[in-house]
Amino acid sequence: MFRGATLVNLDSKGRLAVPTRYREMLNGESQGQMVCTIDLHQPCLLLYPLPEWEIIEQKLSRLSSMNPAERRVQRLLLGHASECQMDSAGRLLIANTLRQHADLKKEVMLVGQFNKFELWDEQTWYQQVRDDIDAEQSTQEPLSDRLQDLSL
């Protein structure tokens, strides 16, 4: 399970160093093989260990290519999916097209989200956190049953 937000740097080749606390887990779970794709709703990237991505691919394969909305989701997620292999120094090369999509510069936030990571431009991440907190404080919407059951 991945959790927490960590500031990492992209080098001049577009590689990021995976924090050491995740490297052993990723090497054991996926031999360092990862898949990176776009997020459909946020200006960030999604980074999955290969076994987790294969579950997503199975779900995508069950969508109908005859349904326009389902086909769009397939096209966006699969069409942007890029395999990344963690090297011996624990670095992942993020494809240039993906870096451009999320406007990733030198400072990148690696955000653990259970079975995957999100990759955010640092400033965009902090703005998103502020926006999320503001939305939670000002929302008039009733909580879903699942959120009502969540006790922190």
Swiss-Prot record:
Domain SpoVT-AbrB span(s) in chain numbering: 5-52, 81-124
GO biological process: negative regulation of DNA-templated transcription initiation
Cleaved signal peptide residues: none
A Pfam family it matches: MraZ
PROSITE patterns for this protein: SPOVT_ABRB (PS51740)
Keyword ATP-binding attributed: no
Gene3D superfamilies assigned to the protein according to its UniProt record, in alphabetical order: Transcriptional regulator MraZ domain
Keywords per UniProt: Cytoplasm, DNA-binding, Repeat, Repressor, Transcription, Transcription regulation
InterPro entries attached to this UniProt entry: MraZ, MraZ_C, MraZ_dom, MraZ_N, MraZ_sf, SpoVT-AbrB_dom, SpoVT-AbrB_sf
Compartments where found: Cytoplasm, Nucleoid
GO cellular component: cytoplasm; nucleoid
Molecular function as annotated in GO: DNA-binding transcription factor activity; transcription cis-regulatory region binding
Major subcellular site: cytoplasm
Family, per entry: Belongs to the MraZ family.
Protein role: Negatively regulates its own expression and that of the subsequent genes in the proximal part of the division and cell wall (dcw) gene cluster. Acts by binding directly to DNA. May also regulate the expression of genes outside the dcw cluster.
Assembly and oligomerization: Forms oligomers.
Official protein name in the record: Transcriptional regulator MraZ
Lineage: Bacteria, Pseudomonadati, Pseudomonadota, Gammaproteobacteria, Enterobacterales
Gene encoding the protein: mraZ
